[in-house]
Amino acid sequence: MANPRQRNKQRSGKPRLTRRNANKKAKAKIYGNFVIQQNWDKHATLRQNYARLGLLATPNYVTGGVEKLYPDPKRENEDRELTSEELDELKKSLPPGQAIVRRDDDGNIIEIIHGEAKTLDDVLDKEISIAPAKTEVVRQLEEEAVKKAARQSNKMLPLSAFEHAYIQRLINKYGTEDFESMAKDVKLNSKLFNGSKLKNLYIRMKATK
């Protein structure tokens, strides 16, 4: 039961002293990649940080960003004559069945460039151009992504209990070399795996022991 002094405090309009935690500015925690955490400026906005690090805050213009989803094509020297090499590249860049019509200033048709189907040699011989990293942070992120992809590609998944028992039965009968005979054994190889598949199961079994 409250005494008279406590009742007077409750009825009084004078505010009581409390800790001013509400006015303290909370420190923002930066989650995500370690490289970005180390280079983050806490005094700048998210868009400013991403622009400084060479990253995109928003993927395209449609979602509210400043980057255009379909940038305006370059119109420099579009009236000049194309070289034979440029003409071949333009034909290969167009899908089959599509064409580009070139006109003069009066609207008369000068040339119709039809798209050509790419051969397998064209795809294999085409050089892949790698754009240089804009900033040191982007270079570190790209290097980290390459290393992570290499680790995942070299990592073998362990066999399930069914796969382990499946390949073990075949190894007990045929050994660890004759995978073609394993593939022909329709009784033990009920899933009809080929020799390459059975060999891969054996390699994974050895690697994950």
UniProtKB/Swiss-Prot annotation:
Pfam assignment, any one: Nop16
UniProt keywords, alphabetically: Nucleus, Ribonucleoprotein, Ribosome biogenesis, rRNA processing
GO aspect biological process, one term: rRNA processing
Coiled-coil segments on the chain, per record: none
Primary residence: nucleus
GO cellular component entries: nucleolus; nucleus; preribosome; preribosome, large subunit precursor
Keyword Ribonucleoprotein found: yes
Function summary: Involved in the biogenesis of the 60S ribosomal subunit.
Family: Belongs to the NOP16 family.
PANTHER family referenced in this protein's UniProt entry, alphabetically: HSPC111 PROTEIN-RELATED, NUCLEOLAR PROTEIN 16
Name of this chain's protein: Nucleolar protein 16
Organism, scientific name: Schizosaccharomyces pombe (strain 972 / ATCC 24843)
